[in-house]
Amino acid sequence: MFKLGIVVNPFAGLGGPMAMKGSDGLDLSRVHADDLGRSAARALRCLERIAESGIEELTVYGFAGLMSAQSAANDVLRIAGLPFISVGQPADPNLTTQVDTREAAQAIVKAGVDLLLFVGGDGTARDIFTAVGTRIPCLGVPAGVKMHSGVYAVSPESAADIVVALITGKLVEVTQQEV
């Protein structure tokens, strides 16, 4: 059984349209409800492609709610058809912070996942690295404004292809990249 961890920064990608350099320090009064689906949509593209690969021995672990792209209007894991186990939840289900990202990553590592997949920008990558260091392989799904780190796949679909290759034994090398 392959254990895949997931952390979604629900605010990733919002900084660009708001003329910011990322979502850190985001003024939520300026965020429109329509904008909150950006990172969830990228997570869905990745997870659906993983599900379409036909891999059955896979369980996804993460924080409940927005950090796993779950909301009343949009439950990405259910839509993709992947089994999910919650390892916690953010302090405020409607507003996640860097602290929540770090706590989610640490809880996911404690669950014994094989790979941590995260959806966000360079700020999210730094938070993930701060939380887990090099203890487990991590792969980013690009969703942010600043995408300079080598830890990201070039698209949600290519991230899915990497995950599938890792699960099926076709990917045998994992390397460190600068965050």
Which ranges hold each PLM region?
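Short, acidic/small-residue loops that bind anionic groups at enzyme active sites
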Residues: 115, 119, 128, 132-156
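Hydrophobic, well-ordered secondary-structure segments
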Residues: 101, 122-125, 138, 156, ...
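ATP/NTP phosphate-donor binding region
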Residues: 1-114, 160-179
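Gly/Ser/Thr-rich loops at beta-strand to alpha-helix junctions
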Residues: 10-13, 64-68, 118-126, 145-147
